[in-house]
Each structure stands twice: as structure tokens, then as C-alpha cells.
Amino acid sequence: MSTQVSELFDADRWAPVAGFDGLDDITYHHDRSGRIARVAFDRPEVRNAFRPRTVDELFRALEDARTNPRIGVVILTGNGPSPKDGGWAFCSGGDQRIRGRDGYRYSDGETAEGIDAARNGRLHILEVQRLIRFMPKVVIAAVPGWAAGGGHSLHVVCDLTIASAEHGRFKQTDADVGSFDAGYGSAYFARQIGQKNAREVFFLAREYSAQRAYEMGAVNAVVPHGELEATAVEWAETILTKSPTAIRMLKYAFNAVDDGLVGQQLFAGETTRLAYGTDEAVEGRDSFLEKREPDWSPFPWQF
């Protein structure tokens, strides 16, 4: 049985992943079937705010899930509740205590006094956004509490979002702290809920509920708090009954309209890879290797 890392965590279902024993800021588990990954922020005392170390660990776990051929779905969530006040959070964004003039700074402690002056600041949470966006697997955000600032942007970039009815809270704090997510967190968010709603969320920076997020189209489902992770697992298990190739191509197709040439390249590259499996592509390869003209006669100009 796994260690109980969160009140919503089912220790009988999940097992820690080998090679990830030294994590400080997140937890990383696979379900007993080895097909679903659970990646969770684990700084509940600061509303699961991230620092550079958090992002390093998050990227490492997500990349491991991406490259594991058995994993089909990733559940991204936040452990809790806070030992300080019992509050819940998915992720409240960057830890402002260690934000410098050049980004978020590496620190040995929890305050600015521990900042490592020899290392540049980072904003590599954007690399995590792109990893979630481009991985050919479904990423479900299970939001047990606050999704604010950079945490709000992370739920936006996930493929699906399920939120706690009792504790799910959303707020885009960028304009309050002199920051702005000018990519997926804002422009793609506007695609999801419409320009007027997105501008309201950013410009007014007000808290809004899980139900309001659902009504705007930012959340797929609002469920009782105690059922949040079980619902995410249920959705994941349903997705795992589908064709892996179809899910992969559908995700890239949905992305392509907003991702420009990068999205087109990903979709076209996957299409090319699939085409390599046809007899027609095999004939093209073999004719080249055999130094002869290809024989396309068996292949009709289909319509």
C-alpha cells in the first residue's frame, strides 16, 4: 500500500514510481494496472504554489509518463488539505516569495533569503504547458481547490478538467501581481469560453466558482469533493477503452487549429508515420533500396 499523500488519494489504487524517490514538491504514482499516471503538486501549506524545483520535478514526471508506452492518461492534481488551515488547492501559481526580476529563482528555503544568486531565474512552467499540450496522451486536471495564476493556466492547457463542487475555486491573478500569460493561459482560454468571459476573468481578477467555470465552458464536470479523484480515474478508464491511435490523432487535430505551423507539423508528422504502415509506402521504400522504379499500379487514386 502507498503512503497516504492526500485525503482524496486512494492508497490501494496507486503505487509510487521507481526512480522517483527523491521528489520534494510533487508526488508521482501509477495505478496498479500501470496505465494511468497521477502527478500531484505537494506543497499544500502554500496552496501548491510552484517554485523552480517544483517545475523541474513536474516536467520530469510528465516526461516519464509521456514516454511510457503503457500510460494512456495522466491525472494532474494537488495534494491536500493544507496542514495550516485545511484549505485545498490544485495549484496557486508561482510562489511570489522567490520571484525575481528575471523570473522565479532557485532557493534553498521558502523565502527570498535563500535565493541562489548564481543561478538565473526561470519561467519554465511554460515548458510544462507545452509538454502537456503536445504529449499524445490525455491529461485530466482534477481540481480539488484553488486554481489561480499559473495554476489556472495549467488547468486551461489540460485536455479535460473536473472540479470539486465544494472547494473548487478559480482566479486569474496575473494583473494583480504584474504578470501575464500571453499564450495558452489567455488566448487559448478565450477560445474555450469566449473573448468577453476571458477578458472578465483576467481584467477583474475575481474569484469564481467551479459551477461558474462549468457554465462558461472552462470545466467539463463539477462533482462532490470526495468523488473528485475517483471520477477522474473513471474517465481515464473509459478513455483507455478507446483506440490509442485515434485518441492521439484526435488530440493533435483539436490542437492544430490553435497551434499554427507547430500544430500542423505534429498532425502531419503523425499522419506520415501512419502512412508508413501502408503497402503503398512500403513499395516506395523498397523500390528506392532496390534501385528500381516504383510500381504504383496496385494503388488506386481513391476518392
Predicted regions, residues:
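Glycine- (often His-adjacent) and acidic-residue-rich active-site loop
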Residues: 46, 78-128, 178
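Charged catalytic carboxylate motif
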Residues: 53, 57, 124, 131, ...
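Helix-loop "lid/cap" segments that line or gate small-molecule binding pockets
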Residues: 201-202, 253, 257, 270-276
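Crotonase-fold acyl-CoA enzyme core
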Residues: 130-244, 278, 282, 286
